[in-house]
């Protein structure tokens, strides 16, 4: 792998006079990348890149660790994707990495190109795939696989040359949901999360037929269609179906050859069979735990509710929610279920439906008296803490130490926050002091550490979290490619030494373990789809006299079968 630096010259173009840093000698190369000036940019990007056999991986300040991972990952994933789509990469592709979603939003690359995709799938512009890091290597891997798959599929369908691309795109009239769905199918296996999204969509009663469904949710509809073809008509017929559609320029002909039916009939069967399957699934589910209050929000086509945070105080009728309307984010506080107060309005109005996966974040303190909110504005991570008793924002400040924050909870007092955050391209656990604007680092490695929560068991207190580290004691390498499943770990909270004790609480082989939390004085819970359905598992932690930590996971006793929206 070779390392290059890029120097900026001119306003509209990025010209790279790069010199290879190695003992053999210097090799000069030139690369031109178009940049516009239509979006507000809050920092200057000093671009560098790694060059491998098949990819140029571009990154900027604080992104070297991520780029190192992506460069190796792309080379590792390429052969399998080439084999699946039955086509090889013809020339070196470019991967442009942004450190997080908000800096991706500042990008002008390919802003005016009609075939740039938006809304859930990796953007591709002239053989440049654009990805971002949200702190989770699994999501980054999916984006890289999507980008590789789109590069290969676009070359198959439309050709490698730009002029040929535009001409063939006009001639080959395949539905966008079909091609984007195929790319997503190649990039990501069908999962319980996708299955839950499909179930919610089909049982909502909003869609008259498949075309209506594909118009509203094209990526989900396309991915589900190809998964249906694989299950009903064999996996090897997925790529063959797309090949026939391209050759004959007719979906009916391809459908007749593979399914022995017209294309519309296949789509009708898709809707009918899946609806019947999900109705049977609902009948077999356990009842929800009994509660005292149900909160129902009226949904609208132009409004999404992306985060819901109830007040933890007993018998409280207060909750906070983030509303998203065409690029604008509203943090809204509801008291007594009806009194509405907008605490924050941020974002820029746009028709693009790209919801920020990270911000705003909400968290209540243990007493339910203060609400913390972390959000992104004007190129900075910002924090405010709203006091429900005094009815004003006690804290309004920038959080300077971190590049992005994925998760936030209050510690035992209102002055400290427990964070999963990215610093120097690594996702780690931190305890952040609000008054001093400094932090204590709990973990420090290249593995993703997510979903932290403070727990207290008999003879043991600490921070429980989800991580893809292979071993509790291992220190991650910046050259490693994390591939392990997410499992639950417990870090000693009071050991301040460099070698903080970390215990492994789960050993999931086939699915990730996420969202751990304390259930009672002896049990913790987490979500996993180990058996193919997302269930909440329970386990308990005990310490023997010899000082050995023993973990007991109740693998067959599910507390409930939650829908994805409840996680």
Go through the PLM ranges and name each one.
Residues 2-14:
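Bacterial N-terminal signal peptides that target proteins for export
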Residues 290-295, 339-343, 391-396, 437-441, ...:
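Predominantly a core beta-strand signature of beta-propeller blades
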Residues 28-168, 175, 192-193:
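Juxtacatalytic substrate-recognition/specificity segment
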Residues 23-25:
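N-terminal signal peptide c-region/cleavage motif recognized by signal peptidases
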Residues 141-142, 174, 301-318, 348-374, ...:
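Conserved beta-propeller blade repeats
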Residues 196, 322-332, 349-356, 372-384, ...:
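A flexible loop/linker signature enriched in serine peptidases of the S9 family
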Residues 31-34, 38-39, 47-49, 213, ...:
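Beta/coil-rich, acidic/histidine-enriched accessory regions frequently appended to metallopeptidases
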Residues 81, 153, 174-264:
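Active-site-proximal alpha-helical
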């Amino acid at each position: 792998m070779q390392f290059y630096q890029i120097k900026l010259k001119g306003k509209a173009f990025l010209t790279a006079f790069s010199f290879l840093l190695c003992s053999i000698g210097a090799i000069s190369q030139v690369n031109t990348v178009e940049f516009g000036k239509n979006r507000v940019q809050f920092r200057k990007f000093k671009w560098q890149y790694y060059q491998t056999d098949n990819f140029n991986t571009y990154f900027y300040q604080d992104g070297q660790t991520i780029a190192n991972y992506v460069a190796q990952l792309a080379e590792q994933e390429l052969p399998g994707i080439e084999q699946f789509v039955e086509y090889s990469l013809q020339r070196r592709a470019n991967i442009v990495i942004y450190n997080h979603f908000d800096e991706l939003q500042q990008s002008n690359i390919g802003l005016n190109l009609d075939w740039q995709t938006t809304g859930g799938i990796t953007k591709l512009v002239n053989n440049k795939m654009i990805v971002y890091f949200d702190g989770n290597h699994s999501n980054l891997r999916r984006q890289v696989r999507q980008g590789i798959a789109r590069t290969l599929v676009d070359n198959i369908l439309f050709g490698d040359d730009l002029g040929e691309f535009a001409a063939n795109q006009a001639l080959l009239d395949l539905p966008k949901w079909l091609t984007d769905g195929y790319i997503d199918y190649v990039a990501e296996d069908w999962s319980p999360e996708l299955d839950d999204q499909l179930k919610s969509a089909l049982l909502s009663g909003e869609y008259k037929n498949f075309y209506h469904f594909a118009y509203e949710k094209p990526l989900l509809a396309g991915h589900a269609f190809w998964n249906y073809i694989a299950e009903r008509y064999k996996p090897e017929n997925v790529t063959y179906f797309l090949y026939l559609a391209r050759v004959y320029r007719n979906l009916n002909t391809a459908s007749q050859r593979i399914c022995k039916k017209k294309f519309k009939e296949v789509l009708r069967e898709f809707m009918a069979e899946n609806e019947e399957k999900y109705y049977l699934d609902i009948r077999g589910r356990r009842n929800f735990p009994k509660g005292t209050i149900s909160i129902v929000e009226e949904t609208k086509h132009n409004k999404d509710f992306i985060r819901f945070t109830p007040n933890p105080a007993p018998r409280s009728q207060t909750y906070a929610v983030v509303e998203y309307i065409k690029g604008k984010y509203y943090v809204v506080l509801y008291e007594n279920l009806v009194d509405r107060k907008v605490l924050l309005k941020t974002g820029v109005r746009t028709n693009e439906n790209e919801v920020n996966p990270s911000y705003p974040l909400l968290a209540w303190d243990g007493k339910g008296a203060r609400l913390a909110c972390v959000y992104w504005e004007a190129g900075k991570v910002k924090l405010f803490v709203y006091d429900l008793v005094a009815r004003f924002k006690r804290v309004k400040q920038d959080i300077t130490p971190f590049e992005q924050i994925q998760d936030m909870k209050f510690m035992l007092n209102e002055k400290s926050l427990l964070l999963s955050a990215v610093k120097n391209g690594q996702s780690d656990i931190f305890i952040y002091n609000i008054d001093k604007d400094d932090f204590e680092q709990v973990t420090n490695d290249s593995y993703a550490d997510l979903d932290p929560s403070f727990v207290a068991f008999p003879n043991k207190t600490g921070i429980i979290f989800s991580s893809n580290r292979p071993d509790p004691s291992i220190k991650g390498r910046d050259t490693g490619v994390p591939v392990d499943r997410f499992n639950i770990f417990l870090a000693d909270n009071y050991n301040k030494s460099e070698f903080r004790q970390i215990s492994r609480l789960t050993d999931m082989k086939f699915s990730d373990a996420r969202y751990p939390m304390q259930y009672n004085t002896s049990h913790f819970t987490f979500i996993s789809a180990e058996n193919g359905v997302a269930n909440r598992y329970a386990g308990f932690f005990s310490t023997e006299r010899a000082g050995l930590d023993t973990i007991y996971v109740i693998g067959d006793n599910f507390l409930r079968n939650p829908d994805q929206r409840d996680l």
